[in-house]
From Swiss-Prot:
Summary of subunit composition and partner proteins: Associates with 90S and pre-40S pre-ribosomal particles.
Location(s) in or outside the cell: Nucleus, Nucleolus
Swiss-Prot/TrEMBL keywords: Coiled coil, Nucleus, Ribonucleoprotein, Ribosome biogenesis, rRNA processing
InterPro entries assigned: RRP36 (IPR009292)
Regions of compositional bias (Polar residues) in chain numbering: 24-36
Chain's role: Component of the 90S pre-ribosome involved in the maturation of rRNAs. Required for early cleavages of the pre-RNAs in the 40S ribosomal subunit maturation pathway.
Gene name, Swiss-Prot/TrEMBL: RRP36
Cellular component GO terms, alphabetical: 90S preribosome; nucleolus
Chain intervals for the UniProt region annotation (Disordered): 1-135, 243-281
Protein name as annotated: rRNA biogenesis protein RRP36
Organism annotation: Candida albicans (strain WO-1) (Yeast)
Residue stretches in coiled coil: 48-78, 161-205
Superkingdom, natural source: Eukaryota
One Gene Ontology term from the biological process aspect of the record: maturation of SSU-rRNA from tricistronic rRNA transcript (SSU-rRNA, 5.8S rRNA, LSU-rRNA)
Amino acid sequence: MSRGKTIRPSYYDEEESSQDELSHTLNKGRSNIGSQSDDEEMSKISFGALNRAQTKLNKHNQKHKTQEDNYKSSEEEFFDSGSDSDGLPEETSSKDTKKKKNKHAPSESSSKRPVSRIRDIPGLPSRKQQTLHTDIRFDAAYGKADLAKARKDYAFLDEYRKQEIANMESLLKDKKSKLNDDEREEIKLQLQSLKSRMDTLKNRDLENSILSNYKKQQMESFKEGKVNKPYFLKRSDKRKILQKAKFDSMKPKQREKAMERKRKKRLGKEFRQLEFKPTNR
């Protein structure tokens, strides 16, 4: 005769039975409010069931509280942004902040937020950096500036620069002028920068005139039939012609200084070529 297997109640069975017991008692207590048997029914509930019920209630209350806080914060952001959309306010969470897959990838923005009417175009200065009154002649939106035309239009400024240089030189030579050392040094620096600017403009004008004259000669010879097609200078040929023209336009002292600089440069180049590394023996 086979014996029957004894089935022991597991921990989960006890937990389910205690939960059923707790729910049964609570439902019964709701239906029989004010009866004398409430205390007896509550005394039969185990402490484990009461503890589990308390933790469930705490979790439910905490979840409800966080949902209310998120709703309030999203409602405040909605009214602060001033959007006229009729939709519900968005819930702000950490999921909205998306990280880039690559640092060179373009930045992503939400399509639910309204785009500002004034946008910053890359390559152009922003609206915040610009002043109220701007000069459209130097605006980058109108293309690259023509330096030759600008130089021709503002050539009259050279007279003012020359007059300013003469005033500075006379002020430095005047022994009666009550200038301290700092003021003299500042005037000397301004005078030097102004002279270097004038030299740069003069050299640029010389280069433009030489190249324009050469181009005119080529076009005239082409029209007369002396050449089959006009010859445009290479960079090396252009540099040689400009150096020769600059050397011819220099004064004797300036030529000596230029020759001395060129000689030192050539010597330094030769010394660098003669240098050698000692071999390890």
